């Protein structure tokens, strides 16, 4: 569907941030691996997280879905052979983390993961190589390092290395499966470690489900090491916090328009890397008050140019791009070369679509240089949910924006339009 965005005058009200997509993925998987029945409170049911949930069901876990909770009967690590190929649609998190999880199935079993056209271009070779060193038989069906992925049961354990500069999901993947390996697992992360907060989130989740681990960061950023011994996940009652990634669109709208807005369910002590959005909008000129579990923002809509390294928060690239497009002066984003390996090449596509709405932009290998003054135009979403939501927010400020293939926002924020309509004043 094409979505035409109309200009509004103000953002105001009180709204609850949606549940975290990243925490929901990890909680669904941990609960599926646990011994006993877990209760997951306030989970996110979006296209991506449902892909993880349904994949876990195919691997043997039982899920009862309710609007405000999910009750999960875990497998205690006894993974079932799926009756069919597991299609995770567009969810890179699902295919990457569950490829390791599938390896803890009995040795005679095979699991095959596939997805949509975009997912079948996502790089997996670094994870494949790291898992092979742990005794896992895993391959790309096309022998090109991308899905479909074929996994044979059998996770021996031992020691392996992995590069840290492509995707933190590879690291989270091995960490989540490691407790059910036959031998202890030592995972060494080499080189630049991007998106590290996501790994910290993984460690936080598994610890809530009873997993112990050791962590050595003596020589950061050159080297990090994780050590996990064989053990079982324990069922628990777990509440999923709000999502700073999804809330970034709400906060960006409040920063670039006259506003008086409170966003609940965002925690001051959150481990989410995208929490940096608070510091960014402050430095660009918005007034922000952060309480324990909510954020209040007031703005006159006039933003200042700003330079930022988003190495640990690459999902914010589209959001920060449109904020900078509306700021006075020249801004620069660096540190996001790994964003070229997301649902799309987000660095390139942000540059192209900013130019399509009249913004002066220079594409760098690891970022963008942006000079503001957008005029509007036709935007291709590239079937990327974050592109849709970012350019929708820009449209609220300037009007005259039409977004192609806009329905994919349901990948991470199913009620995005409803929320934005609630806080918009014409």
Swiss-Prot record:
It catalyses: 3-phosphoshikimate + phosphoenolpyruvate = 5-O-(1-carboxyvinyl)-3-phosphoshikimate + phosphate. It is found in: Cytoplasm. Pfam families: EPSP_synthase (PF00275). The active site is at residue 315. 3-phosphoshikimate binds at residues 21-22, 26, 167-169, 195, 315, 342. The keyword DNA-binding does not apply. PANTHER family: AROM/DEHYDROQUINATE SYNTHASE (PTHR21090), PENTAFUNCTIONAL AROM POLYPEPTIDE (PTHR21090:SF5). Belongs to the EPSP synthase family. The gene is aroA. This is 3-phosphoshikimate 1-carboxyvinyltransferase. Keywords: Amino-acid biosynthesis, Aromatic amino acid biosynthesis, Cytoplasm, Transferase. One of its GO terms (molecular function) is 3-phosphoshikimate 1-carboxyvinyltransferase activity. GO terms for cellular component: cytoplasm. GO terms for biological process: amino acid biosynthetic process; aromatic amino acid family biosynthetic process; chorismate biosynthetic process. Phosphoenolpyruvate binds at residues 21, 92, 122, 169, 346, 386. Its EC number is 2.5.1.19. It comes from the Archaea. The keyword Amino-acid biosynthesis applies. Its main location: cytoplasm. Monomer.
